Regions:
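Active-site acidic Asp-centered loop
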Residues: 32, 77-80
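A recurrent flexible, glycine/aromatic-enriched loop bordering the glycosyltransferase active site
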Residues: 123-143, 155-158
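Conserved short acidic donor-positioning loop in nucleotide-sugar-dependent glycosyltransferases
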Residues: 30-35, 56
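Short aromatic/hydrophobic "clamp" motif used to bind/position activated sugar donors
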Residues: 74
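Glycine-rich, basic loop-to-helix element that forms the pyrophosphate-binding segment
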Residues: 53-69
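Acidic helix N-cap motif at the loop->helix transition within catalytic regions
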Residues: 14-18, 35-46, 86
Length: 159
């Protein structure tokens, strides 16, 4: 099983950003800026595909990354997330332990100002409590998202 990280960023120097984030998997990085171009490189054995796009909106950025995702699993991320060593392996293990799940939420250590809900055990998330979880905690089966044509709404901010 292979995981791909989908990063949304705004006006970043992408090579230093990718290094800082400690990306431990192939990555699609959407950098919203003032130009349209593509670049690709390898970092620590992982393919980084970067799309510089002259557009704005985090939902649009996540949708662009999701459309290009081609791994078994994908994990949404923001430019200020720094992954602990072993994070990718733990996410893959979570899906192996729960083959019935199309999406799993994972705790991600973030700056105190961004701290949000913290899960202490496995449970099903429902429509009435899903809003408490940040997008960067979502890992999902890419094929299921593509099969159901699921995307982020562009009608309001925040992704």
């Amino acid at each position: 099983m292979k995981l791909q990280i989908l990063v949304s960023s705004l006006n970043q120097e992408v090579k230093s950003l990718a290094e800082k984030m400690n990306l431990q998997a192939d990555t699609i990085l959407i950098n919203q800026c003032n130009e349209n171009r593509y670049e690709e490189w390898t970092q620590d054995g992982h393919q980084i595909r970067c799309y510089h796009l002259a557009e704005r909106g985090v939902g649009l950025s996540r949708n662009n990354a999701l459309l290009r995702a081609d791994a078994d699993l994908c994990l949404f991320s923001d430019e200020d997330i720094v992954y602990d060593d072993g994070a990718v392996e733990r996410i893959i293990e979570g899906f192996e332990q729960h083959p019935e799940a199309d999406m799993l939420l994972f705790n991600v250590r973030v700056q105190e100002s961004r701290f949000t809900y913290w899960n202490s055990f496995y449970k099903r998330v429902r429509w009435y409590n899903c809003g408490r979880y940040p997008a960067y905690s979502f890992a999902l089966r890419t094929a299921k998202m593509h099969e159901k044509n699921l995307t982020y709404s562009l009608l309001f901010g925040g992704g």
